[in-house]
């Protein structure tokens, strides 16, 4: 069975819901290391790292947004300056290039709301903040769409050179996404329960 890096966020759920692959969970920055070190054969890697490391991309699946993304937002804090969770590379670079913002790295986004004027949060923690009504200054996908007008790619599918069974693994994930579109309710329910957020937000 092909070992596939699954980025540890809710948006990965449809890709792996019904896929017969060995999922290796990892954070954004860890994913590239697992592939480079041979601990996985295929996986999703932030597009910034894939480009920086010259990793071979499989142009079949990607994690991207067209317009507002909800799970990548600059939330309004009560302090000064701008902070970003350490896991983000793509969103921080996008806001740096488009809005001229630079960020201090933080580990705890909730604590950072007290210290920083704006906190860039991505993934599941961003969804929790939206669910709890934390106001935001900017939605990364929305800013990108308004300023650039193209889809914003967060993560691309990368293969380890020489790995076997990749075509079958990619097909498994494509079929899993197709199952999700046919019947999204079980995935929506599972994600809402796991994150402790409203079903309506997950549906968005």
Where in the sequence are the language-model features?
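Conserved residues at the C-terminal ends of beta-strands
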Residues: 45-46, 85, 122, 160
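N-terminal hydrophobic or amphipathic helices and topogenic motifs
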Residues: 1-54, 58-61, 78, 178-204
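Pocket-lining segment of extracytoplasmic ligand-binding domains
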Residues: 107-190
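Short linear motifs at secondary-structure transitions and domain/linker junctions
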Residues: 33-37, 47-53, 64, 68, ...
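Active-site regions of enzymes building and remodeling cell-envelope glycoconjugates
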Residues: 20-25, 55-62, 82, 100-104, ...
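Hydrophobic/proline-rich hinge and linker segments of small-molecule sensing/allosteric domains
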Residues: 57-78, 147-161
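Bilobed "Venus flytrap"/periplasmic-binding protein-like clamshell domains
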Residues: 1-19, 25-26, 65, 69-117, ...
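Helix N-cap and loop-to-helix transition residues
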Residues: 27, 46, 89, 139, ...
């Amino acid at each position: 069975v092909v070992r596939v890096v699954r980025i540890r966020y809710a948006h990965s759920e449809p890709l792996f819901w019904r896929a017969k692959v060995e999922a290796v969970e990892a954070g954004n920055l860890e994913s590239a290391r697992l592939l480079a070190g041979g601990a996985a054969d295929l996986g999703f890697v932030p597009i910034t790292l894939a480009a920086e490391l010259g990793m071979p991309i499989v142009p079949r699946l990607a994690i991207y947004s067209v317009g507002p993304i909800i799970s990548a937002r600059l939330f309004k804090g009560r302090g000064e300056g701008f902070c970003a969770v350490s896991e983000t590379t793509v969103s921080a670079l996008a806001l740096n290039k488009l809005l001229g913002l630079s960020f201090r790295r933080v580990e705890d986004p909730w604590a950072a709301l007290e210290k920083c004027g704006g906190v860039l949060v991505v993934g599941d923690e961003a969804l929790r903040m939206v669910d709890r009504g934390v106001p935001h200054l900017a939605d990364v996908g929305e800013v990108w769409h308004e300023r650039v007008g193209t889809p914003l790619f967060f993560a691309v599918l990368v293969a380890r050179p020489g790995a076997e069974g990749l075509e079958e693994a990619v097909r498994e994930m494509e079929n899993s996404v197709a199952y999700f579109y046919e019947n999204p309710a079980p995935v929506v329910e599972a994600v809402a329960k796991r994150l402790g957020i409203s079903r309506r937000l997950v549906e968005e």
